[in-house]
A protein has these predicted regions:
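Mature extracytoplasmic or organellar-lumen-exposed domains after removal of signal/transit peptides
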Residues: 23-299
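Sec/Tat signal peptide C-region and signal peptidase I cleavage site
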Residues: 18-22
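Bacterial N-terminal signal peptides
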Residues: 8-17
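Bacterial N-terminal signal peptides that target proteins for export
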Residues: 1-8
């Protein structure tokens, strides 16, 4: 059933402010209805998807390396006493990670150690398990503490290096790659548009752009396997959010703070991205693959 754009706009302001919705994605709980049985292992991807998956894994490696490079620049900026440069390097590093974040979630608990929020922990920012990107963000933007930022960055670099090694030797099933396009947009709808992602730097718009780009890269890889009509529809649906986001990007390619986003543009993004997410969710049917495999009459 197609979602009516007007209805989405009417509901947008209510859903964007719902805190429970923002936590649903973070919890990592799959929607497992009574008619679905999760497969005990990944089913090998059909041959036609393997070049697409291989290209995406190469891109994942490059994005991880780019995030690593920005974190190293962050360390150098801190050593030089340049907090402004360190903060910008953080925002760029998180952008590079968010492009692939929806797929990283597939790699076990990688995202939970690389990108946890303080809200995951009882002691919040004071909890020793609060590490990763948002620990650096807290040190840079809330505490203004270069030493804490250096320590958190060194810790994150170890986890980023571990992710790089996993990407080098592992792969994604085609079903999960396709799912990641939809999930990348859901990251925006569930946390970013409500301003719930970057609580200290307020750099949600940069991450929104990253998640849109992440979904686009998956779709671009799948384009030869999709119908001309689907490719045309998706092209138009990406153009809407792109036009809104362009209003908040400066000549250096940097995005404004979240608070600059007008209520009208926020609702427009919600409407456009909801329609895009619906179309991306339908790709599994067109490609004749699914995220959850059903096993019936299993002994």
């Amino acid at each position: 059933m197609l979602i009516n754009r007007t209805a989405v706009l009417v509901l947008a302001s209510l859903l964007l402010s719902a805190p429970g919705y923002a936590e649903k994605y973070r919890a990592g709980n799959p929607d497992t209805g009574s008619d679905v049985v999760i497969a005990k292992g990944d089913i090998p991807s059909p041959e036609k998807f393997r070049p697409v998956v291989a290209d995406y894994m190469t891109m994942m490696g490059k994005q991880t390396a780019a995030a690593e490079h920005q974190l190293q620049l962050l360390q150098k900026a801190l050593a030089a006493g340049d907090m402004a440069a360190a903060r910008q390097a953080y925002i760029q590093a998180h952008y590079d990670y968010e492009v692939i974040r929806a797929a990283v979630v597939v790699f076990g608990h990688a995202d939970r150690v690389i990108n946890p929020h303080a809200g995951y922990f009882l002691s919040r920012e004071q909890d020793p398990k609060f590490t990763g990107f948002h620990r650096i963000e807290y040190a840079l933007f809330a505490q203004n503490d270069p030493a804490a930022a250096q320590a958190a960055t060194a810790d994150l670099l170890r986890n980023i290096n571990d992710l790089k090694q996993r990407i080098d030797v592992e792969t994604l099933p085609a079903a999960k790659l396709v799912q990641s396009a939809d999930d990348s947009i859901e990251l925006i709808l569930s946390t970013k548009l409500s301003g719930d992602e970057n609580r200290y730097s307020r750099s949600e718009l940069s991450d929104i752009a990253a998640n849109i780009e992440g979904a686009r890269r998956i779709v671009s890889g799948l384009a030869p396997l999709l119908s001309a009509k689907t490719n045309e529809t998706l092209g138009k649906q990406f153009a809407g959010p792109d036009a809104v986001m362009a209003r908040y990007r400066d000549t250096r390619g940097q995005y404004a703070e979240y608070e600059k986003l007008t209520p009208e543009d926020k609702q427009q993004l919600y409407a456009d991205l909801t329609l895009l997410a619906e179309s991306l969710a339908q790709l599994r049917a067109e490609l004749k693959i699914d995220v959850y495999y059903k096993y019936r009459n299993e002994p």
